[in-house]
């Protein structure tokens, strides 16, 4: 997985969306990140570790290529605005889900 800066992440995410426009999917995950690079041991906890500030870890993949970035709390507003504009521009190919009516469900149950 490639850890990128915020601006580079947004440009690579745009490329992923363009590549998967006709067929394919892009999966995006967002989670809290405390700065650790190694997993926490099961039996004991590391008591001396204190995160300096709150951070978010964003990951994106198309199944083949993975990209990620870490956004600090200081730059989250700027990143969120650019990220939301990118999502609005690239999520135009979504299809509405077919919802079955209640009457069809009740007929099938009888």
Swiss-Prot record:
One of its GO terms (biological process) is protein targeting to ER. Residues 96-110 have a biased composition (Basic residues). InterPro entries: Signal_recog_particle_SRP14, Signal_recog_particle_SRP9/14. The modification Phosphoserine is found at residue 45. One of its GO terms (cellular component) is signal recognition particle, endoplasmic reticulum targeting. SUPFAM superfamilies: Signal recognition particle alu RNA binding heterodimer, SRP9/14. Heterodimer with SRP9; binds RNA as heterodimer. Component of a signal recognition particle (SRP) complex that consists of a 7SL RNA molecule of 300 nucleotides and six protein subunits: SRP72, SRP68, SRP54, SRP19, SRP14 and SRP9. This is Signal recognition particle 14 kDa protein. It comes from Bos taurus (Bovine). The gene is SRP14.
